[in-house]
Amino acid sequence: MTKEVIVESFELDHTIVKAPYVRLISEEFGPKGDRITNFDVRLVQPNQNSIETAGLHTIEHLLAKLIRQRIDGMIDCSPFGCRTGFHLIMWGKHSSTDIAKVIKSSLEEIATGITWEDVPGTTLESCGNYKDHNLFAAKEWAQLIIDQGISDDPFSRHVI
């Protein structure tokens, strides 16, 4: 017997969203009542742009550190295969607005304050593809995204 599965992100109409934005995908509860929230952190417009792998990889490593410095409860921040943004998985209840503020602040630091020495996990021992990083691209993308503004609504521009 095959279990019917609906993957929410494949049900989203990618032609009507307006990136950059943060969107709450789902809230789920574990067997003991623990809440996990899953966010769509969309940095570039789907099917119109994508962040090249090395820049996205560096943003990923930086967000792993910067988000945790700004908010408690981060489980993981993983890039979408389409390279337009990230899934952000959090313990507890968080609003799209709060997450958008954290992402904005993190990207501002990437754009203006980060040096190569600040990028975590860039050695053979600490990264599975340590040669595939590009801080220049990460900084350029971060600034482009900040300049557009990050919305807490995926369908209308409500920039925070």
From Swiss-Prot:
Task: Please share the entry's free-text remark on the cofactor.
Answer: Binds 1 Fe cation per subunit.
Q: Name one Pfam family in it.
A: LuxS
Q: Does the keyword Amino-acid biosynthesis apply?
A: no
Q: Which domain of life is it from?
A: Bacteria
What EC number(s) does its UniProt record assign? 4.4.1.21
- Binding residues for Fe cation: H57, H61, C127
Q: Which reaction does it catalyse?
A: S-(5-deoxy-D-ribos-5-yl)-L-homocysteine = (S)-4,5-dihydroxypentane-2,3-dione + L-homocysteine
* Needed cofactors: Fe cation
Task: Please cite one Gene Ontology biological process associated with this protein.
Answer: quorum sensing
Keywords tagged on the record: Autoinducer synthesis, Iron, Lyase, Metal-binding, Quorum sensing
Tell me one GO molecular function of this protein: S-ribosylhomocysteine lyase activity
Give a yes or no for keyword Amino-acid biosynthesis in this entry.
no
Task: Return the SUPFAM superfamilies for the record.
Answer: LuxS/MPP-like metallohydrolase (SSF63411)
Q: Report the function annotation for this chain.
A: Involved in the synthesis of autoinducer 2 (AI-2) which is secreted by bacteria and is used to communicate both the cell density and the metabolic potential of the environment. The regulation of gene expression in response to changes in cell density is called quorum sensing. Catalyzes the transformation of S-ribosylhomocysteine (RHC) to homocysteine (HC) and 4,5-dihydroxy-2,3-pentadione (DPD).
Quaternary structure (record): Homodimer.
Task: Indicate the family of this protein.
Answer: Belongs to the LuxS family.
Q: What is this protein called?
A: S-ribosylhomocysteine lyase
The record lists the organism as: Streptococcus pyogenes serotype M4 (strain MGAS10750)
Point out the gene that encodes the protein.
luxS
